[in-house]
């Protein structure tokens, strides 16, 4: 093991030890901010945005690109063979909560800064996993002036220029309560209205099956949570469903919503949007991000299904790609790990990008 990787693992060991699970997002008391402030070669600019959302900007010189790494993680869950917050290093892997998603990238960047860089810009954020993105949205408001943004997520050290967007919402249906022996239950039951809508929505989602970008095909649509009703002999007066879909770059959201028939109708139904974020690239034009990939000399990835905050930068007019060590299939599960060889590769690639 070379000295650069040893230093990287030292930083990763520290980062994993801080419980930055989101929820509960207790960043202030986790030790993370104290650790970054204790590093003499850093001068972190910390912005407290409230509710556990912190932007931590590291900047020096005149960098062309800015790196973004989220330092919050999902909760550990059950099934770990070791302490999730104690980095377990084997001959091939570094195992620990956030090692793959995506504290490994942060450790790489801290290593390179410690070894000496003249020009760099790194934004650590802490609220990606909750689907808030307050950190990125607020940072964008400062009108950052960079040639592009490299958002860190586990991509096997390949450059991602294209991924799906995300849209969630709640459709609520209203009925007229009464005894279920009444024939009107067929029409007045809110659950009946909901199931009819679900049938329509599934068919509408399938109508997009022939649309594709690379290996990404159709509209990823999911009925996620249903609630409503009281008991079998009462006509349900209210029922709701939470659903989501993942559009391809260039797909029109309003057109999709119209196809799903999410309109609110007086005394019948109401629709409430949830978390909404664009695809990457936000305008559907891959040209700028592909040019950025060439400029950075990164190996390209196929388009991916998962969403990242790169799309928010893209929406704001900043070319953005997704890049980082680790495989997404190893994230969000017990015994999360990143391969040591990928950390070594990422160190070299990040070094080349900065220089």
Annotate each PLM feature:
Residues 1-77, 238-244, 256-259, 340-342, ...:
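N-terminal helical capping/dimerization or prosegment-like subdomains
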Residues 38-43, 59-65, 113-121, 143-146, ...:
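Short glycine/proline-enriched coil/turn segments at helix->beta-strand junctions
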Residues 48, 154, 161, 167-355:
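Metal-dependent amide/peptide-bond hydrolase catalytic core
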Residues 66-121:
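Active-site metal-coordination/substrate-binding segment of hydrolases
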Residues 68-70, 123-125, 150-153, 172-174, ...:
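Short beta-strand segments
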Residues 90-92, 112-123, 145, 201-210, ...:
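Phosphate-handling active-site elements
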Residues 98, 102-168:
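Acidic/histidine-rich catalytic neighborhood of metal-dependent amide-processing enzymes
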């Amino acid at each position: 093991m070379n000295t650069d990787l040893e230093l990287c693992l030292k930083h990763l060991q520290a980062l994993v030890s801080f419980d930055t699970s989101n929820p509960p997002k207790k960043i202030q008391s986790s030790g993370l901010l104290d650790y970054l402030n204790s590093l003499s070669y850093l001068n972190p600019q910390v912005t407290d945005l409230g509710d556990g959302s912190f932007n931590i900007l590291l900047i020096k010189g005149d960098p062309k690109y800015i790196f973004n790494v989220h330092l919050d993680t999902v909760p550990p869950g059950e099934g770990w063979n070791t302490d999730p917050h104690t980095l377990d290093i084997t001959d091939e892997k570094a195992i620990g909560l956030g090692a793959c998603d995506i504290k490994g990238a942060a450790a790489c960047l801290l290593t390179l800064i410690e070894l000496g860089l003249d020009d760099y810009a790194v934004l650590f954020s802490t609220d990606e996993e909750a689907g808030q993105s307050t950190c990125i949205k607020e940072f964008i408001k400062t009108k950052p002036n960079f040639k592009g943004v490299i958002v860190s997520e586990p991509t096997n050290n390949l450059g991602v220029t294209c991924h799906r967007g995300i849209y969630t919402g709640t459709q609520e249906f209203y009925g007229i309560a009464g005894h279920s022996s009444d024939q009107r239950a067929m029409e007045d039951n809110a659950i009946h209205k909901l199931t009819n809508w679900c049938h329509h929505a599934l068919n509408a989602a399938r109508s997009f099956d022939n649309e594709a970008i690379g290996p990404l095909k159709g509209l990823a649509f999911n009925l996620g949570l249903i609630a409503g009703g009281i008991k079998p002999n009462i006509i349900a007066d209210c029922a709701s469903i939470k659903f989501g879909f993942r559009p391809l770059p260039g797909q029109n959201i309003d057109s999709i919503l119209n196809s799903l028939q999410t309109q609110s109708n007086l005394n019948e139904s109401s629709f409430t949007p949830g978390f909404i974020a664009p695809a990457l690239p936000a305008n559907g034009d891959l040209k700028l991000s592909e040019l950025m990939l060439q400029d950075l000399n990164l190996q390209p990835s196929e388009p991916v299904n998962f969403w990242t905050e790169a799309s928010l930068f893209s929406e704001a007019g900043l070319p953005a790609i997704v890049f980082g060590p680790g495989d997404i299939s190893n994230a969000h599960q017990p015994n999360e790990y990143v391969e040591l060889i990928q950390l070594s590769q990422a160190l070299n690639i990040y070094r080349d990008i900065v220089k």
